[in-house]
Structures are given as C-alpha cells and as structure tokens.
UniProtKB/Swiss-Prot annotation:
GO molecular function annotations of the record: DNA ligase (NAD+) activity; metal ion binding
InterPro entries: BRCT_dom (IPR001357), BRCT_dom_sf (IPR036420), DisA/LigA_HHH (IPR041663), DNA_ligase (IPR001679), DNA_ligase_AS (IPR018239), DNA_ligase_CS (IPR033136), DNAligase_adenylation (IPR013839), DNAligase_N (IPR013840)
EC class of the enzyme, as a word: ligase
Residues the record marks as active site: K128
Alphabetized SUPFAM superfamilies for the sequence: BRCT domain, DNA ligase/mRNA capping enzyme, catalytic domain, Nucleic acid-binding proteins, RuvA domain 2-like
Catalytic activity: NAD(+) + (deoxyribonucleotide)n-3'-hydroxyl + 5'-phospho-(deoxyribonucleotide)m = (deoxyribonucleotide)n+m + AMP + beta-nicotinamide D-nucleotide
Similarity-based family: Belongs to the NAD-dependent DNA ligase family. LigA subfamily.
EC assignment: 6.5.1.2
Any one cellular-component term (Gene Ontology): cytosol
PROSITE patterns in alphabetical order: BRCT, DNA_LIGASE_N1, DNA_LIGASE_N2
Protein name per Swiss-Prot or TrEMBL: DNA ligase
Pfam families: BRCT, DNA_ligase_aden, DNA_ligase_OB, DNA_ligase_ZBD, HHH_2
Gene behind this protein: ligA
Keyword Ligase listed: yes
Length: 719
C-alpha cells in the first residue's frame, strides 16, 4: 500500500492503486470468508479498505466495477455445501476508527433525515462479535435452513451443522411470523477454545490458532457430529426476510429474539446522544479482557425501524449502522537497527530491526519506518511528527500492528536520564550500487539513480518485466530470475530484458547446459524456451507496462497504447517531447509534449517520467537490444482475428482449476472477447467451474450458453 497521501496522488496513480487494492482486498476476502485462513490482521485489512474508500472519495470517477466498496465478503469456496441465495442480502457495515468518525456518522443520519431536533434519534450500541455471520430461516415456526454470509448474496447451506448448536432453537414459539430469518454470529467461547486446544495437545494433535477460525472451520465440517463436539455458540442481533414485524425498534426486536429462546448480548443498550454511545464504547473496551468471547468493536444502529427504512442502504452497507472498531494493538520494544531496502523503482525504504516482541499474538521483529522525514520527526512542510521526536537506534519504541502488512513504529518513549544514540543519517548513496540517491522536490521518498545498473532494481525490474500483467513468461518466477541474474556464466546470466530472449541461442553455443543444472531438466527447459518464444510478439500496452517506467502502471500503459497505437509512434513522441522551461509561463513545451498531455488521464508527472526514461542513454541501449528480439504489436492489430469468441461477452464463475481469474480475463481479451463480472442479457457465454452458484442459475434462466473450463480451452484453441 502506498504511503503517498490521497491528496497528492495523480489521477493515474490513484487508478493504479485502486486496481492493486481491489486485487489485494479480494484476495484477503477469500482467505477470511471462504477459507478461514486470514494472512493479515483485522487492522491491516481495515487499513486497506480505508485507503480504498479515501481514494474513491477523492476520485469518484475512478470507482471500479470490482471495487471492494461494492461487494461484501467472498463467494463460497467449497463445492461440498450447496449454495443458498439470501432473500435479503447480508451486507457488511462501514467502519469508524475514532470518536470523530462516530460523530460524523450520527451527523450524517440527522442530515439525511432532516428537520429532526438534536438528540431525538435513539441509537443502540452492542459489542461486535468476532465470529461467523449466519442466517437461520424458520417457516411456520420450524427451522428449515442455516446459511453463511458468503459474498453477501449467496452463502453456504450448513443447516445440518446449525442444528447441532444447542443455543439455536429448532422451533419458534406459537405466534411467531410465518417466515422469519434470524441473523447473528456463531462463535466459540474463549474458555471452550482453551479446553479444545488442551484436548488436542493431550492427543498429540495440532492446536488451533484462534476461536474465530476454529468456529468457522467447525461449522464447515462435513460430519455434523464433529460440529456438535465443538460447543459452538450464537448471538442473535439482526434479521433478514420477515413476513411480519412484531415490533418497531431494533432493541425491541432483539428482545423478541430473547423471548423466542435466542441468546442476545447483555451489553446492548440504547442512547440518545453521541456522548452516550462513546461512553458505552469505552465501557465495553474496559470490559473486553474479561469477556468469554472475542469482540473487535462496538456496533451502533438507529433504533427506530421506520427511520432505518428511510435511511436505506448504500451499495454494500446500511446508512443506519456503523462498526466502531477498537484500536490496533501496541507493544513497547527496543530499536536495534535500521536497514535500507531498495525497491524496483529505486525507492530507498527504511526498515526497523526490533528486539522481538509479541503484538496481538504475533511475534514482530521488523517494522516500517516509512521515509527519512518520519525518522526525523519533521514532515515535508515542517510540521512535527510525534511532537518532533526523532527515532534513533537504541530507543524504546511503540510498535503497532495496523495499516500495513508489516507493523509500524508509531512513537518513541524517551527515558529520563538515558543517553540516546546519535541522530540517524539517512543515506544519500544507494546501498545496493553506490549510485547517488536523490529526493525530488515535494516527494517524501529518496531514490537511486542507478536504474538497470543497480542490482536491487535490476532484479526487481526483470521480475516486473516477466510478471503476469507484463510479458507473463511462465517458468521465470522470482527464484529463477534471481538464479539467472546471479549466474556468472555468460551463457546463463540474465541482466537485462533482452538477455531473456537470447538465452536459448547462448545456450546452444555453451558447454554449460541449463538442463543439467539442479532444479532444471530437459522438459522444464523446453517449456521455458517455448514460453519465451511465445512472447516475441507482445501487446503494446504489456510492452510499455513491462518497461517499468515510473508512474506507468497497467492503466497508464493501456491509455498510452490506445493513444499512440504503435510503438514507433510512442517512442518518437517520447524522444521529441520537451517539457516547458521551469518558470517560463509562455513556454508550453514542444508539440509532442502537448500531445502527450492531451492523452486522457496522462498528466505532467507521467509525461515527465516517460521523457526522463527515454532521455537516459543507458535505457535507450537496453531498449534497442530488447527491440532486436521483441516486436510490440500495433494496438489496433493486437486482438486475435477469427476467434470464435471475438466480440462476445464472457463471464467466468465458480472455481477455475487450470487458470486464475486474471489469466482467464487475459485469455479472453487475447481472443477479442470482453469479460464481465455479472450475467445479463448481454452475456454471450458463461464458463462455469465447480461451486458456480447464482451466476450459473441466472445464465440457465436466460438461456445463455454454459461451458466448463476444459471446453473453454478447446473453444479458443489453447487446449
């Protein structure tokens, strides 16, 4: 995740980051909701979503069709449980992280409803249970189904397992509405979790990580007897479809649940003021360590149901509710050292080496220090950071697991009488190649000027060059790139992109054969050569993206390719583009410069990056060698002709086993087809894998052709 403030992002940088965030959040949604194997903390996940929402708020025109703000959770991943389409979607809640966020939420409710006096709207406040969301359906008082949230629209049918939870009644009392969907959270008590782990340890089996994942895994057991043995519990707090509403308030409905025999949280209360909500939030936070269940915040809801109806919903969340999350966990440790890492674009990033400390159940040894200003304690505009306290080796520091995938240092604790180390001097020379490291005006990052001669950048740039959305060369993963880069034999080494395409020829004239080296073999080497040869012709936008020009991500590469249509035209423009002289308001720059700025979405920052790249003689040498081996296809000629799917709209659904979603999309586009995320009358073809649910059902209903993954490969001739 970028550390550039949203206000400083260009439109192009924002679009590229939204694309990265959409992929990252979808990945973590699948791990959390569908596989119960989260890789990052809740705080880190929340930070990704906050960043996405902040960028979308600042650039509303860039909101993507696959934006995380338009979806909930992840589609069910297991084909062992039948899909269940929720009568009413199970939406997630927006998050608040500060008192000010809560005041903004309450204010937005009053503004939306209008003309209501202060403190006239009541809100409920209840703990946010860290478990698995569940919808339980009753018809004529009888429990007929239980389903997980899934992606909010379609969940998994876990009825047999739900029936084993003692706290969930199989029948409702007489007088209950004919159709009732009770929603709440399935969880495992901390005490039961400890007992289960003690039992597993005594039996010599692997213990479980945490109650939430254990509860989710227990609920997805194919054998309901296993679920029954896990002592799962339930809190009711919401509802889906109801044939008749017994009461007219949120608190009243929860009381009805209690009367029907459902457990409800005893800490739920109603307040008429923001101060009351915040006081209860703090009270629950104080009580949190003593509770026998995990919570990660407090949920506030408008109490009157008629006001909830008026407020309605956004695309993925209600306007009448919000989750006030607890702050990330922190710990105190010692800063033992500061290392400088050099990234693909030459950015010098400081990383703290810490005395090992446990934060939120995870042992932390490294933390981000962001940039040199953050270490100094003074921002770009002279504003103080941490009240102006700098960070020095040997300091006691507060580490927080939040925001980034790796933790961060949020403060320094100065101990009276303790002598501090010397102020940290941020290097002005690249530690990887010795080139000068410069910091451009207005930027927080210092960068190496070494380009492809810098080993740190060269390896990363080659990895980027062969990555999926660039040249996509199968068989050249991270380890292989590092092997070839570090190879001393001239017949094996790959130090620049062109070296990839001369590898086979160099091998033919060498005594050192790649297939004789450990980790390679005749078959894998042939596949590698075939994969390389398959990319000797490449789509123009992939070629441009693969060059690793700063600020030219996937989005900008496609924009430039569509604008110039051929590589020759683009290169000519890049070489002829001359920006205006600094301080000369009458100078508009060369005609080629003005033409580049006229490309939709391309601003001066991107244009300058392109001009700087082509203005470097070493880069032009690298390009000349590459163009001797590779032909970038003209944009208008790059789509396959004569393909049976050319011009058609294709939807991929279910679990794909032979390719990822990105690969499927790329393959479809390569054959002239368009891909869509949902099925409609405009859809021509649906490719369905195991676990296909609502999209498959809709395709069948509309009479749209449906094929499996193997048939897709045969259809496009890539079997």
């Amino acid at each position: 995740m970028s550390d550039i403030s949203v206000e400083k992002l260009t439109e192009l940088e924002a679009a590229a980051e939204l694309e990265r965030l959409a992929r990252a959040i979808a990945h973590h949604d699948e791990l959390y909701h569908a596989k119960d194997r989260p890789e990052i903390s809740d705080a880190a996940y929340d930070a990704l979503k906050r960043r996405n929402e902040a960028i979308e708020a600042h650039f509303p025109a860039l909101v993507r069709d696959d934006s995380p703000s338009r979806r909930v959770g992840a589609a069910p991943a297991l084909a062992t449980f039948a899909p269940v389409v929720h009568a009413r979607p199970m939406l997630s809640l927006d998050n608040a992280f500060s008192d000010e966020d809560v005041r903004d939420f309450v204010g937005s409710v009053y503004r939306f409803l209008g003309q209501l006096p202060d403190d006239s709207i009541a809100f409920t406040a209840e703990p946010k249970i860290d478990g698995l969301s569940m919808s339980i359906r009753y018809e004529n008082g009888i429990l007929v189904s239980g389903a997980t949230r899934g992606d909010g629209t379609t969940g998994e049918n876990v009825t047999a397992n739900i029936r084993t939870i003692a706290e969930i009644p199989n029948r409702l009392p007489a007088g209950a509405p004919a159709v009732v969907e009770v929603r709440g959270e399935v969880y495992m008590a901390k005490s039961d979790f400890l007992t289960l782990n003690a039992q597993m340890e005594a039996e010599g089996k692997q213990t479980y990580v945490n109650p939430r994942n254990t509860a989710a895994g227990s609920l997805r057991q194919l054998d309901a007897k296993v679920t029954a043995s896990r002592k799962l519990r339930f809190f009711a707090y919401a509802w889906g479809e109801m044939s008749d509403m017994p009461v007219d308030t949120q608190l009243g409905m929860v009381e009805v649940f209690r009367q029907w025999g459902f457990p409800v949280n005893p800490l739920m209360k109603r307040f008429n003021s923001v101060d009351g909500l915040l006081a209860h939030y703090r009270a629950i936070g104080m009580e949190r360590p003593t509770l026998d269940y995990d919570i990660d915040g407090v949920v506030y809801k408008v109490d009157r149901l008629d006001l909830q109806t008026r407020l309605g919903f956004r695309s993925r969340s209600p306007r009448w509710a919000i989750a006030h999350k607890f702050p990330a966990e922190q710990a105190l440790t010692i800063l033992r050292g500061i290392d400088i890492q050099v990234g693909r674009t030459g950015a010098l990033t400081p990383v703290a080496r810490l005395e090992p400390i446990t934060v939120g159940g995870v042992v932390v040894t490294n933390a981000t220090l962001h940039n040199e200003d953050y270490i100094k304690g003074i921002g770009q505009k002279g504003e103080p950071i941490r009240e102006g306290r700098d960070i020095r080796i040997g300091d006691s520091v507060i580490v927080q697991r939040a925001g980034d995938v790796i933790p961060q240092i949020v403060d320094v604790v100065l101990e009276e009488g303790k002598k501090r180390g010397e102020p940290y001097q941020f290097p002005h020379v690249c530690p990887a190649c010795g080139s000068h490291a410069v910091r451009e005006e207005g930027e927080a990052v210092r960068r190496c000027t070494g380009g492809l001669i810098c080993p740190a950048q060269a390896v990363e740039r080659i990895r980027h060059f062969v990555s999926r959305n660039a040249f996509d060369i199968e068989g050249l993963g991270e380890k292989q790139v590092e092997f070839f880069f570090n190879a001393e034999d001239p017949a094996l080494c790959i130090r620049s992109p062109a070296d990839i395409f001369t590898l086979k020829k160099r091998q033919e004239n060498s005594l050192t054969k790649l297939q004789n080296i450990e980790g390679f073999g005749a078959t894998s080497v042939k596949k590698l050569y075939d994969a390389i040869d398959a990319r000797r012709e490449i789509a123009l936008h992939r070629f441009l993206f693969g060059l690793g020009i700063r600020h030219v991500g996937e989005v900008n590469a496609k924009r430039l390719a569509r604008a110039y249509l051929s590589y020759a035209a683009f290169e000519k423009a890049a070489l002829e583009a001359v920006p205006p002289k600094e301080g000369d308001r009458t100078d508009k720059g060369s005609e080629a410069w003005q033409d580049m700025l006229a490309v939709e979405g391309i601003g001066s920052i991107v244009a300058e990056a392109v001009v700087d790249f082509y203005g470097e003689p070493h880069n032009r040498e690298v390009l000349a060698a590459l163009l001797a081996e590779v032909t970038p296809l003209d944009e208008e000629a790059r789509v396959a002709t004569g393909s049976p799917v050319e011009g058609k709209t294709v939807v991929f659904t279910g679990s794909l086993e032979r390719m990822s979603r990105d690969e499927a999309k790329a393959m479809a586009e390569r054959h002239g087809a368009k891909t869509a995320g949902s099925v409609s009358k405009k859809t021509d073809l649906v490719v369905a894998g195991p676990g296909a649910g609502s999209k498959l059902a809709k395709a069948t209903e509309l009479g749209i052709e449906v094929i499996n993954e193997d048939d897709w490969f045969k259809l496009v001739g890539e079997d």
